[in-house]
Amino acid sequence: MFTLRAASRRAFSTSIARRNLISEAYTREVRAFKAPKLSAKDAEGQVKPWSAPSAPKPPVVEGADAAELQAYAEAPVDVEGQTNSKSASPQANDEDWLAFEEEEGVAV
């Protein structure tokens, strides 16, 4: 009967309980920590009294008087590509802006 018990004990694998010393020391210190009691007087020097901010000044717009605004409204509008005189050079073809120069002497 003794041999049967010895054989049954050896059939089970056992793991060694490993201790994590750092984790245990940390949890022990956290549990032992007692926070100091604070009163309202302790916070007086640490907190500034609240005061409402001052109202912001409105922005100043350049040329806000009526004469400057009227002059701006009456100013001619510049449009790109528009010519002022009839004697100007004829308008370029739309495809001229992307013209590739043909290379000479290239054999295909």
Curated annotation (Swiss-Prot):
<dbReference type="GO" id="GO:0005743">
    <property type="term" value="C:mitochondrial inner membrane"/>
</dbReference>
<comment type="similarity">
    <text>Belongs to the ATPase h subunit family.</text>
</comment>
<keyword id="KW-0138">CF(0)</keyword>
<keyword id="KW-0066">ATP synthesis</keyword>
<comment type="subunit">
    <text>F-type ATP synthases have 2 components, the catalytic core F(1) and the membrane-embedded component F(0), linked together by a central stalk and a peripheral stalk. The central stalk, also called rotor shaft, is often seen as part of F(1). The peripheral stalk is seen as part of F(0). F(0) contains the membrane channel next to the rotor. F-type ATP synthases form dimers but each monomer functions independently in ATP generation.</text>
</comment>
<feature type="compositionally biased region" description="Polar residues">
    <location>
        <begin position="81"/>
        <end position="92"/>
    </location>
</feature>
<keyword id="KW-0809">Transit peptide</keyword>
<keyword id="KW-0496">Mitochondrion</keyword>
<protein>
    <recommendedName>
        <fullName>ATP synthase subunit H, mitochondrial</fullName>
    </recommendedName>
</protein>
<feature type="compositionally biased region" description="Acidic residues">
    <location>
        <begin position="93"/>
        <end position="108"/>
    </location>
</feature>
<dbReference type="GO" id="GO:0015986">
    <property type="term" value="P:proton motive force-driven ATP synthesis"/>
</dbReference>
<dbReference type="GO" id="GO:0045259">
    <property type="term" value="C:proton-transporting ATP synthase complex"/>
</dbReference>
<feature type="compositionally biased region" description="Low complexity">
    <location>
        <begin position="47"/>
        <end position="60"/>
    </location>
</feature>
<keyword id="KW-0472">Membrane</keyword>
<keyword id="KW-0375">Hydrogen ion transport</keyword>
<feature type="region of interest" description="Disordered">
    <location>
        <begin position="40"/>
        <end position="60"/>
    </location>
</feature>
<dbReference type="Pfam" id="PF10775">
    <property type="entry name" value="ATP_sub_h"/>
</dbReference>
<feature type="transit peptide" description="Mitochondrion">
    <location>
        <begin position="1"/>
        <end position="19"/>
    </location>
</feature>
<dbReference type="InterPro" id="IPR019711">
    <property type="entry name" value="ATP_synth_F0_suH"/>
</dbReference>
<keyword id="KW-0999">Mitochondrion inner membrane</keyword>
<keyword id="KW-0406">Ion transport</keyword>
<comment type="function">
    <text>Mitochondrial membrane ATP synthase (F(1)F(0) ATP synthase or Complex V) produces ATP from ADP in the presence of a proton gradient across the membrane which is generated by electron transport complexes of the respiratory chain. F-type ATP synthases consist of two structural domains, F(1) - containing the extramembraneous catalytic core, and F(0) - containing the membrane proton channel, linked together by a central stalk and a peripheral stalk.</text>
</comment>
<dbReference type="GO" id="GO:1902600">
    <property type="term" value="P:proton transmembrane transport"/>
</dbReference>
<feature type="region of interest" description="Disordered">
    <location>
        <begin position="75"/>
        <end position="108"/>
    </location>
</feature>
<keyword id="KW-0813">Transport</keyword>
